[in-house]
Amino acid sequence: MEIINGPVLPRYAAPATGALTSDAKISGQLLRRVHLRRRACGLQGDHYRAARRFFGFPSERHARSGWVWPVCCSYGSSSDGDGAAAADYDASGEEFVNSSVMEAVELRSVSDGFVIKMRDGKNLRCVQNNPRVLRLRDSAPHHAIVLKMEDGSDLLLPIIVMETPSIMLLAALRNIRIPRPTIYNVVKEMTERMGYAVRLVRITEMVHDAYYSRLYLAKIGNEEETISLDLKPSDAINIAFRCKVPIQVNRRIAYNNGLKVVQPTPSESYVSSDQFQCTRLDRPDDQPCFEAQEFDLVRNMLVAAVEERYKDAAQYRDQLFMFRAKKKNMI
């Protein structure tokens, strides 16, 4: 693996001064026309304020409750917003590495690193690949989507997400049939009906502890005509997995924020005479198995959420919280 030293330096696309001047002139002309028409028709001030929010300058359009556009789109072959050509999205492919999705459930911080809990109940102990980067100051578990780098480094990139995208991705990984279509299935079908196909998803940069990703679409029959969308990584990864397209990660992000899996400590494992690595085995006894009870609650909650039985899922969630609190008090 080629190691890139130094901090992550995200690139920002500085808008041209001429574009800002042109935008200001157009906004001012539209605003003056609306103002004159308001006076001629006798409209009230609320209509004028609404027009200012729509046709005014960016500071006026987005001043209300910090509202911003949820999706940014670049069309054509000029630029995708970060300096790379939108149509030729493989031009800077050397900056990215392919990755695969792991069946991870949650991520939590411990004293000596991190622990990734997998769907099958296994825990992966990890340490930061770059010790200078500090993340996850609290020890509470977080829902996470984990990407594994496919360049031979085996680095893991955890992305903290909300509960619903994590459950939807696990359902897709396990081929669990959901009775009603999800938003990701709707986006996939809508894209195909518009004559486009999803080609690629990239995790491009990290700004203020938030990952940025882009979804690349290409016109079917004309690969030169592309659309680049700015999406949340959780949504972009869900769409990419369902469309079976590559998921790429910026190499600097993988190096600076990736985790390395460490071997279990000697107290947790031993090597038998036949040289097989054996871990501690669960042995039946007369005591209740808390791990099995916790696993049953988690499984029932996930199944209920996937089947859209949200009331049952909420009940299982409350039972799980009470069970974990009781277990913590017993320790």
Curated annotation (Swiss-Prot):
Single GO term (MF): nuclease activity
Location(s), subcellular: Nucleus
UniProt cross-references to InterPro entries, sorted A to Z: BFN_sf (IPR036104), Bi_nuclease_dom (IPR003729)
Domain BFN: 126-261
Top-level class of the enzyme under EC nomenclature: hydrolase
Positions of the UVR domain: 291-326
Keywords, in A-Z order: Hydrolase, Nuclease, Nucleus
Its EC number(s): 3.1.-.-
GO biological process: protein ubiquitination
PROSITE patterns: BFN (PS51658)
GO cellular component: nucleus; VCB complex
Highest taxon listed in the record's lineage: Eukaryota
Family: Belongs to the bifunctional nuclease family.
Reported function: Bifunctional nuclease with both RNase and DNase activities. Involved in basal defense response. Participates in abscisic acid-derived callose deposition following infection by a necrotrophic pathogen.
Protein's recorded name: Bifunctional nuclease 1
Origin organism lineage: Eukaryota, Viridiplantae, Streptophyta, Embryophyta, Tracheophyta
